[in-house]
Amino acid sequence: MVIDMYPAHILESGEIQTVREHCRSTAELAARALRPIGLTQSAYLAGLLHDLGKCKEEFRQYLEAAARGDEAIRGSVNHTFAAVRYILEHWHHSGGEFDDSDVTAELLAFASGAHHGLFDCIGVHQDSGFFHRQTKEGIGYEESVQNHLKECVDAATLDSLFQQSVREISAVIERITQLTAQESDEEANREITFHIGLLARLLLSAVIEGDRRD
């Protein structure tokens, strides 16, 4: 079911902020935050997708119930998994050589999917936090994607933004690699992995800043 203007927030005054308004504003604020270090498009894309999972009737009903003062358990309607699944299904390779596009997809999936709480990409038992989010049922994924692409941004624009993000992330990885050029392979790999972890937190921080400020 496709209905225009899905709500992202309903204020105490009754004013509605739509998912389109909120995602675009969050994206702009996140992009502005990371513009000085050349990650504008990466931050923009993560912000644009972070609330993809709100574009469904179940979330509309949840927000409207809360606005009326009805009993509505905060966080009871999952909206954070959808962006992770979309990003990984469309831009992450399921097999073969792991390259910068895969790194970019995982960074964006984490930044968009962890804006309400961190999750382990790899758990203590080697389980994947990404896989859990990709395979979770009953979250209205197809409905959310259909409505988000109609209301917020089309698929071709998302694909273009992702390719620009890959170029940005590749440039950062190249700079990190240059900094470790004098290290042994083992030490260099450790340093690169550490700095990519910092990059993940930086992108997430930009999305959270945009989300909270908007």
Task: List PLM regions with ranges.
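Accessory nucleic-acid engagement/destabilization modules that flank
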Residues: 2-214
